[in-house]
Regions:
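Short terminal targeting/anchoring segments
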Residues: 1-61, 67-68
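Extended, charged coiled-coil scaffold/tether segments in eukaryotic proteins
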Residues: 44-88, 92-96
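Soluble periplasmic/extracytoplasmic beta-strand elements of cell-envelope proteins
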Residues: 75-77, 84-88, 131-135, 188-190, ...
């Protein structure tokens, strides 16, 4: 039988304990690096959230300052939470069942849109803008149509045609090439039919207010946060 001397046992123990210490140090360094990455990611997201909030408040303030005197005349509403301006008078916007812009609405757009886009192209906001949505909305009814499904589809086609007409009209008025290209890259036309109705206090459909056109601003905060999360997952 081989007798292991105490000094050999001690050397083996030292070797094992040394290896264990090295493994613990590696684990500690990995943990620190992992926690550091999480903290860095959280800091980046916090900065984006703060920038988003400041941008939202700034745009809302500037829109309110610019258009307060006009909103009532246009029968329009500014929603600070969604950064949208909503034109609510269907008689001003279009003829019933038609996608052609009324002259009164063209006059409003001639006044509104250049001032609107001037705010968004301000250097403090320009790089934060992801999308400018033109949304067309209708009531749930369609003249002579009893089927709610067919009424929805008819209104979908109409609302899409209307937003396309609005987009074409406002873009055709921009003569500066750089401004045209920037606006074109951000502007979208979205016909939503009766999918987002406006209701009265008693929860009945407000058909007049449901027939509307909205200009809605979307910032790129969500896109930046998703980019950070995607990078950190690699």
């Amino acid at each position: 039988m081989k007798i292991i001397k105490s000094s050999e046992k001690e050397n083996q123990w030292v070797s094992i304990s040394g290896l264990f210490s090295i493994l613990m140090m590696i684990f500690l360094f990995l943990s620190i690096a992992y926690m550091g990455n999480i903290i860095l990611k959280q800091k980046k997201i916090t900065v984006i959230a703060q920038t988003y909030e400041e941008t939202q408040k700034g745009i809302s303030h500037d829109l309110k300052k610019e258009f307060t005197q006009n909103l009532r005349v246009w029968n329009a509403v500014l929603d600070s939470l969604t950064l949208s301006i909503r034109f609510e008078d269907p008689e001003i916007l279009f003829q019933v069942g038609s996608a052609e812009l009324n002259q009164h609405f063209k006059n409003i757009l001639d006044n509104f849109f250049p001032r609107f886009i001037q705010i968004l192209t301000d250097p403090k906001y320009k790089n934060e803008i992801e999308e400018i949505r033109i949304e067309g909305h209708t009531s749930s009814e369609w003249s002579g149509e009893n089927s709610p499904y067919q009424a929805y589809f008819n209104n979908m086609e109409l609302s899409q045609d209307r937003t396309h007409k609005v987009l074409i009209y406002i873009l055709s008025k921009i003569k500066d090439e750089k401004l045209f290209n920037w606006t074109k890259s951000k502007l979208t036309a979205n016909g939503l039919s009766s999918s987002k109705l406006i209701y009265n206090l008693d929860q009945t459909e407000n058909k007049e207010r449901s027939r509307r056109v909205e200009f809605k601003i979307k910032t790129n905060a969500e896109k930046q946060i998703n980019k950070i999360l995607k990078q950190s997952s690699k």
